């Protein structure tokens, strides 16, 4: 599933092409995604100029003068920028095209867990949308601190890894990045969130930012389907300290990496480096 780094890589790849350009038309071939594509979306966007492309958590927010169209990539979704001249014929899983003058922005999603929604400007700020309003803080914002994590976890018995994954404290820390961040911070993922001290949470906040920044720099992680807007795979997964390295020696101390299951998801950690 594309997480924050993959969505941010997509945003950075798309924005230079679409910002300041007008949508000539929208072709919706499959309306039944995770939620139905709004029936009037094509008409709402016709001849509209894209003002900006923002990311909130794992959502992409395309702003036009009349509102925002919101895209979520789901588990297998991608957005590709294709030249209008000679654009490939749409395949089975190519559900939506936004046609501009010189290129096509194509949404592909084999499993159809992604979404394309519309938020009109008269409904208020897009960040008040029900899917966005309850999200945690952005990991690169000044609001994301060790003090925030410490305050929000007092008395909580859930594991620190599961607390990170929940998304109500900080957004975008998916399974890979939670394991990697906890390794960098030296925190065992099974530790109760409420038992982690303030200094350790300060290290964790720094580790989350560093891990996500490294992943974005490497184009995200491609475990199965993800490619960026240019069709290239990410390669962060090749440099992971612990994720998907069960039984292999820790890159720091040489102890075999352990794999456990938490909340039906695989967790990887070093029993020596993480306490």
Curated annotation (Swiss-Prot):
Please name the source species: Burkholderia cenocepacia (strain HI2424)
List the molecular function annotations (GO) for this entry. 8-oxo-7,8-dihydroguanine DNA N-glycosylase activity; class I DNA-(apurinic or apyrimidinic site) endonuclease activity; damaged DNA binding; zinc ion binding
- Please provide the Gene Ontology terms (biological process) for this protein: base-excision repair
The entry's free-text remark on the cofactor is: Binds 1 zinc ion per subunit.
Pfam families, per database record: Fapy_DNA_glyco (PF01149), H2TH (PF06831), zf-FPG_IleRS (PF06827)
Q: Which residues form a coiled coil?
A: none
Instruction: Show the SMART domains listed in the entry.
Output: Fapy_DNA_glyco, H2TH
Q: Relate the protein's function as given in its record.
A: Involved in base excision repair of DNA damaged by oxidation or by mutagenic agents. Acts as a DNA glycosylase that recognizes and removes damaged bases. Has a preference for oxidized purines, such as 7,8-dihydro-8-oxoguanine (8-oxoG). Has AP (apurinic/apyrimidinic) lyase activity and introduces nicks in the DNA strand. Cleaves the DNA backbone by beta-delta elimination to generate a single-strand break at the site of the removed base with both 3'- and 5'-phosphates.
Protein name listed in UniProt = Formamidopyrimidine-DNA glycosylase
* Family annotation (CDD domains): EcFpg-like_N (cd08966)
EC numbers on record: 3.2.2.23, 4.2.99.18
The record, for HAMAP family, names: Fapy_DNA_glycosyl (MF_00103)
